[in-house]
Amino acid sequence: MQPATDTIAAIATAPGQAGVGIVRVSGPRAMAIARTMLGFEPKPRYAHYGPFRDRQGELIDEGIGLYFPNPHSFTGEDVFELQGHGGTVILDILLREVCSLGARLARPGEFSERAFLNDKLDLAQAEAIADLIESSSEQAARCAVRSMQGVFSKRVDNLVEAITHLRIYVEAAIDFPEEEIDFLADGKVASDLQGLLEQVQQILGEAQQGTILRDGMKVVIAGRPNAGKSSLLNALAGREAAIVTAIEGTTRDVLREHIHIDGMPLHIIDTAGLRDSPDEVEQIGIARAWEEIRQADRILLMVDATTTDKTEPHEIWPDFIDQLPRSAPVTVIRNKVDLSGEPLGISAESHQTAPVIRLAAKAAEGLEVLREHLKECIGFASTTEGGFLARRRHLDALERARDSLLQGQTQLEGYGAGELLAEDLRAAQDALGEITGHLTPDELLGKIFSSFCIGK
């Protein structure tokens, strides 16, 4: 992508009526538009209160005009803002007048795109702006601000720099064999490579938490009919989201509730009871339940504690466990312990294949233990000091970088192949470069910025 040469404009505030509405202009004609609508040439970075007029001198509105010359603006271009009254009609009139003076309507995210193209921010920072706007909790907002300030980008850049230094050392040994640099003998390359792997794994772990904080953790409640799945959904949601009866098969479709636990967003999904059923509608619900189960970040296997004393998933329901993906994380929920006489709490002994939580969903007893467990499942701390938000594409890039480094380690240890190691280091660099936008295809850039709201 090349920096733009035309002038764009958009309403930068949310649609609807409000006390203040903003029309934003960016590009080479920003000053000319400002001069026409204010009636004078505004002083840079000063708030000028007065009338906004059209080309014929007719009054449109009055408010504050702000002018920011390049490169000291959000986009890196000349920027002019009209801050007037927030009515839909008046903002549309202002925008039409601005466009008649040589601007065009901005595409979604085009202001942030221009800031990226003019090196005012990198791609991860630009995405953080959209994440800040869309944040669903205070902690997500705070982490988005840190990403916007470059906390995540700096970590990635430092890692890329370290890979670059190691790559230079390895390629020097390849290109200048007469210097007799033996990068196997002193262990420097192996040590540095291991350090890089530890760094990328640490960043990946933090990015996984940031992704869950942004997107939410998908928790699916599964089990046989009448195990108490809907009662648990209601208890966690704090309302009667699902109908609860003693009739088996009451829940026939997927029910979703979005909740927060100490700022962590969770998508709690209640599913139809799993069984062989001749009922066509129930069969559809069960099929949908399996779709959700296979995509879950955490599966809560609900067990009626009054019907069995088993705690191992394979012993409780071998057919169910055999159908799960191998990596599917399962927590056994022994429900109705107020009837079975078992104590509330959690047991997660080393010999257990899955944690076991004992609670009484209908009586809302033992829920705090479950909430704490869900936080621990993703390594979520009550504080997000130093944390950042991340996206799925960031995880993919970090995983590819890690895999390239692991492959390079194999080449080094198994064959002493410097050429192959150098290529793996380059692949890791390229993957990390996609995060900040240094090596990102134009098609992906367009897709990312088009998901932003207009005016950003």
UniProtKB/Swiss-Prot annotation:
Its EC number is 3.6.-.-. It is found in: Cytoplasm. Homodimer. Heterotetramer of two MnmE and two MnmG subunits. SUPFAM superfamilies: P-loop containing nucleoside triphosphate hydrolases (SSF52540), TrmE connector domain (SSF116878). Its main location: cytoplasm. Belongs to the TRAFAC class TrmE-Era-EngA-EngB-Septin-like GTPase superfamily. TrmE GTPase family. GO terms for cellular component: cytosol. The gene is mnmE. Its cofactor is K(+). (6S)-5-formyl-5,6,7,8-tetrahydrofolate binds at residues 24, 81, 120, 456. This is tRNA modification GTPase MnmE. K(+) binds at residues 226, 245, 247, 250. It comes from Marinobacter nauticus (strain ATCC 700491 / DSM 11845 / VT8). Residues 216-379 form the TrmE-type G domain. One of its GO terms (molecular function) is GTP binding. Coiled coil: none annotated. GTP binds at residues 226-231, 245-251, 270-273. GO terms for biological process: tRNA methylation; tRNA wobble uridine modification. The lineage of its organism: Bacteria, Pseudomonadati, Pseudomonadota, Gammaproteobacteria, Pseudomonadales.
